[in-house]
């Protein structure tokens, strides 16, 4: 009997239906020689620093860097029951093999392997690796199960990624939070992404617009000079041309063709969904995941933009489904070969609607899912269509010794552009003229313009920058060393927003991503190794090398550890930066646990370090029972001296009042108080 473990219950149910596992039990299904169970995403996570050393519950600079000799995973309490079920199933004598049916990617591999290892299982692993949740795809996948050993490199890559994120997050967050007195959540991949945004805003702020001038003639069509810096020069040319005639110097007409874009991978689809539909990258991924589980589109977390060669015969059927989704006609000619290239497919092929999508009632889908499915369908229709062909005409004329140029465009065959949702306004067609022909000038005018600054990042353009590690004009065939992966980039952006480092700000129809003052301040104080997009991209590249078995995991982890040791030993706080991280609240003292500032809020006195749980509650029963209030001055005295006098305390036993001193007691996890008298 085989035990199949999926990543979530909904996927397990789809697999069980195909395998004939119809008998329901607590936490699993059974039948047809299979037991099908599930995780709830990550059932286990890397343990907190205090699990390795209780002293590390308190944040101190002296304890850094924290680098465990071996890492431990712990099961989340709310997921313990399902873990216990999986462990029990793995230990059944009837179970001979365990099938990893978690998400076919790095994180799915880690989810399964962590549970497998924590359960102490040593039974053979088989791997289900599919790109569609359709019944036929599941059935075919089980007929071609692969050895789990084939994915040991993927597991090691995932494990190294998790450990590296833990090490950088724990150490850098504590180090810079303690150094600058405010919680600064720092991530291995978050910080360089934030650096891209901060750098762009700096470029915009430093930009000084410069005016420029052109002269435009109306000679039956508009003809224009190049840009000029001096208005006087432009005025002189315009005046010289008024009432004159132009001579046609050259007419160049070239027929050109533009090949269809490749199919969508996750990043390119997220970019178009943001640009065209206004969806965030996380929304698009969520919609795609829902469509995948509904068997309406293929696996979303892919970095490939082609189908495999053996799928060429299925392309016409997929195109029919895509046309049905869009309510559009199929291309007159389907060029299947141009979307198939096994050499350009990594773990999963491009995102396309499935055959099942042809029969779906589009009105029954939520709006977001419906629009994203249509976008993916248009991507397929576009990719298999013929090139867009057009004729470009360039006319050069001379007037008063000055050259003027006019450009026009005529569409010959629309080709793949018939499926574009956004129709770009084409250059107007030009009249037919011949060389040496003379034309009269009806008007000559000076046009004024200004150079424009770089544009703020949107999710569309930030995703492109992350994919290329901030490098512009990267060739399509270049090996990309990007920040994060297609599967993680949307989460990185969302975490930057939720952490208060980035905000979304709408401008007309566009939503820009802008660094907050805190985000800008963080990049100001971070050293190069924590904010370099290129270095982070190189780390991601090395994780891929681990996956391929080209380098040892230990060499990668040693590099991370060495970087953290160097950071702690050599980083010098930047003087004057205390003004960069103001909380806006009045400081009453220093936190006895982590040393950060304690400020007053309506309900109490809180440590500014968000990762520290220290708080003195104003409504504490200790004070209200004595008919006293924890005032700001009392809290300040307790934080400074550990004790403070308290007069006129009410006794619930006697009904009388008395004077005493209150002691602050804190064990690193809980805060308490104790009354002492002058004689005791």
Task: Say what each PLM segment does.
Residues 1, 101-104, 181-183, 253-262, ...:
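Conserved short loop/turn motifs at secondary-structure junctions
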Residues 1-162, 166, 453:
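Intrinsically disordered, low-complexity regulatory segments
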Residues 30-32, 218-221, 398-402, 654:
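Short strand-coil-strand connectors
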Residues 137-219, 253-257:
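C-terminal or mid-to-C-terminal helical accessory/interaction module adjacent to the motor/catalytic core
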Residues 2-3, 79, 90-93, 118, ...:
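Basic, low-complexity terminal or inter-domain segments flanking catalytic cores
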Residues 9-16, 33-36, 40, 76-87, ...:
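Amphipathic alpha-helical transducer elements in NTP-driven molecular machines
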Residues 232-264, 270:
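Metal- or metallocofactor-binding catalytic centers and their adjacent structured scaffolds
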